[in-house]
Amino acid sequence: MLKNKGFYRGINLGGWLSQCDYSEDRLNNFITESDFAKIASWGLDHVRIPIDYNILENEDGSFKESGFARIDWALEMCHKYGLNTVLDLHKTAGYSFDSYGESESGFFDSAELQERFYRLWEEIARHYGQYSETIVFELLNEVTDKSYIDAWNRIANECIK
């Protein structure tokens, strides 16, 4: 974790924008302003927000403004309650390890899916790069298969450029 102010004690908001049923009711009501207030009252300094790519992208790879609006709202709440944010892309097109619906695979072998990943991160950076003091980014959750180390290091390096 960063050795900057505000990234020492946090909580994960899993099950809201990731690894969920994606219903509008859940997306709109699973996490509320009172949750952010409670987290701050516990003395925590940041929240980790896992997000699945399909919150931010349509099937064709175009962006969903409604997904970015959810993150915008979460960042407003974090600012209001003095919390920093870890924004975690929990899965991407072609990479998933959860049991919610799709069986995603092929990311590490597909230039097309990797380009889509880069475009998504460019859009995330465009939206949230100005929050550099209060937000950190996890490019992709739990890339643990050792056979993908070289591919992942290449992809991560390209994405960060």
Regions found by a protein language model. Give the residues of each.
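Active-site mouth of glycoside hydrolases
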Residues: 2-161
